[in-house]
Structure formats: structure tokens, C-alpha cells
Amino acid sequence: MKVSYHGHSVVQIETGGKTILIDPFITGNELTDLNADHVEADVILLTHGHNDHVGDTVAIAKRTGALVVAVAELATYMGFQGVENVHPMSIGGAYQFDFGRVKFTQAFHGSSFTEEDSQKIVYTGMPGGILFTAEGKTIYHAGDTALFSDMKLIGERHPIDLAFLPIGDNFTMGPEDAKTATEWIGASLTVPIHYNTFPPIKQDPHAFVTSLQSGEGRVLEVGETIEL
């Protein structure tokens, strides 16, 4: 399994001949190396409905026919936007797809999509994290979240090989809370995400990784790939 980081919270997974994108915020993301008009995807997983996570989902899904997996309200909203291939889920639920197993975990954040043209904010269900398992490996993408005590339970119940945790502060947990989350989750490797995209979430990811136990964390540069 190949896992790549593409800035902000964008993660790409390649497994079993399938390409999976998590939170494909590309247009407007000055940190990413992806092009929304050319990126390929068989599956798009969405942690929640904020614009900087839904990103280019609709355009990519329409162009590629990708399956969009999200909590029920967000999946329904994607359908309203013309996405034909959606799979609704809910927090705590899991489903075995042909490309891997997806389970939605709790996250403490908001979830809504801002329609700037009409100045409307659309409710898109509960925010979540995602546990993705394939090829005997489990990845935890926490989405946007505060630190919460059930992260201990997530770590106890699921042996996690790779965790993506937000460190930006302001909108999510910051480095200190993310360090505690790392300890509670107990992943083999933790990668910081959701930082430096906008001024309010400017952080030093290398300082965060240095604060962890040796070997527990790693900064992935934009476009960098690791193999599990």
C-alpha cells in the first residue's frame, strides 16, 4: 500500500489497483501539488463537510465516476450536487468495500458546507475520523478534531499503523493536544496534517515531531509517499 500526503488534509492511498483520496481540497490550496483537473480517483472519502475538506470532490467525482463515501447527510448533499455514486455511512459504522474496510469514528468539530453564492450554510451531519484498513494495515485519518478521551478507545480497539493528526490549532487541536493524542492512539507512525495552509493554523511540524518519542512521528513533505 502506498500513502501520499498532498498538503492540508489531503491524503492519497493506492491499494489493490485502486486510488483513494481523502478530503481532496485542491483548488484554493496553495500547498498542494495536485491538479483538480487531472487527479485520478476511484474512491473519495470525506471526513466532514467543510469547504476545505470537501474541496473538489464534486468535480473529481463527476469526471472520474469515483465513489464518494461520507456520513449520510454529506453523502446526500453530494448527490444533490450531481454526484451519482455515493455510499452513506454514520459515526461508528463500518463497511467492507472491495478496496478496503472503512469505519467512521467520532470527531469533535463542526460539519457544514458554505454556499458562498447564496450565502447559505448547509448542515452536513456529524464530523468524523476515518479508519481505513487494507492489505492488513490500518490508517487513521482524524479529520478535523479536538483532543477527546475516546481516542484512547480508538487506539485500544484498533492497531493503527499510520495516523494523520491535525496540529494547526485554532480550528483543531494544536501540537500539545496532538502529542497527547499520539500517545493515546499508539500508532506505529504519526504524521501531522492541517497546518500552514492559512495564517491562523501556522505551525512547525518538525517541532511537533521532535516532541514525540523517537520514531513515533514523521513529517511528510507535499507529494511525499511512504509504503506500508
From Swiss-Prot:
**Domain of life of the source:** Bacteria
Query: Which Gene3D superfamilies does the annotation name?
Result: Ribonuclease Z/Hydroxyacylglutathione hydrolase-like
Its family remark reads: Belongs to the UPF0173 family.
User: Pfam families attached here?
Assistant: Lactamase_B_2 (PF12706)
Q: Which NCBIfam families match?
A: PRK00685.1
Q: What is this protein called?
A: UPF0173 metal-dependent hydrolase ABC2731
Q: Cite the GO molecular-function annotations of the record.
A: hydrolase activity
Question: What keywords is this UniProt entry annotated with?
Answer: Hydrolase
InterPro entries linked: Metallo-B-lactamas, RibonucZ/Hydroxyglut_hydro, UPF0173, UPF0173_UPF0282_UlaG_hydrolase
